[in-house]
Amino acid sequence: MEAAERKNELRKRTKEFAGSIIRFYMALDKKREELRVIGKQLIRSGTSVAANYREASRARSSDEFTAKIDLCSQEADESQLWLELLREECGISSEMIDPIWSEADQLIRIFVTMSKNTKRNHD
């Protein structure tokens, strides 16, 4: 797969991740205050992954690219935290959470590798 294809594939994948977060939030019972509050935090972090990846795609320098990719990783990690809290403290089923958590984990691994490779090639 060429670099442009990988870039477009990851762009699509991060957008799909954001969409899965939105659909997950829409399925929550917003009458429960804790679900509404944590769900909104999850929406912010989960959609931020896609937004920051798009910004990274348009970076003007290696340093800017690395900074945005690192933000993607951080936001995906934060999304995992909110998902864990929803499962462990709010009783949301693993069946609902695990696929999204796993995708966040895979994205984190990709972003960490991208960041390391960019830093190595830049030094």
Question: Can you say where each PLM-predicted feature lies in the sequence?
Answer:
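Amphipathic alpha-helical assembly/interaction segments
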Residues: 1-123
